[in-house]
């Protein structure tokens, strides 16, 4: 195959989402609270569809299963990437994700090893990574007593 695959992908509304995907990047969005654009996805909650060429109309998960040669003959049982573009217009929740081994064993799907590339950010934007507590119990207790919100 000598041409790239262009994908029709899925938008996900989030309480913390915004309009930047439309206003700054030109995407058509279904509401003013779009938080995630799953640009490349074979995840059951939002599978990309091929838009062009001989595979037009085919779902990415099916294409991966039936034409592994297009993906370098990868050995993972399911397509191994989920590429998202986020619009975080408000605070995000604390995130804890399993690795692939734990995810497959306990949740039936791959884990979520992450890599971030910040495209744009407001001047007062923060990323909080890690913590200074000496025990997990103290860290979790401190988080629960501070700004805990079931909606973040």
Where are these regions (language model features)?
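Transition-metal
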Residues: 1-133
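A short, charged helix-loop
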Residues: 135-139
């Amino acid at each position: 195959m000598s041409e790239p695959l262009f994908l029709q992908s899925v938008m996900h509304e989030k309480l913390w989402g915004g309009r930047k995907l439309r206003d700054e990047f030109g995407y058509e969005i279904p509401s003013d609270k779009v938080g995630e654009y799953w640009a490349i996805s074979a995840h059951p909650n939002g599978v990309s569809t091929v838009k062009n060429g001989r595979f037009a109309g085919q779902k990415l998960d099916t294409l991966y299963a039936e034409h592994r040669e297009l993906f370098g003959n990868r050995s993972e049982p399911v397509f191994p990437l989920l590429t998202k573009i986020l619009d975080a217009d408000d605070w995000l929740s604390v995130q804890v994700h399993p690795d692939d081994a734990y995810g497959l064993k306990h949740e039936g799907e791959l884990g979520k090893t992450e890599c971030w590339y910040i495209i744009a950010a407001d001047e007062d934007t923060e990323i909080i990574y890690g913590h200074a507590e000496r025990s997990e119990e103290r860290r979790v207790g401190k988080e629960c007593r501070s700004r805990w919100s079931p909606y973040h």
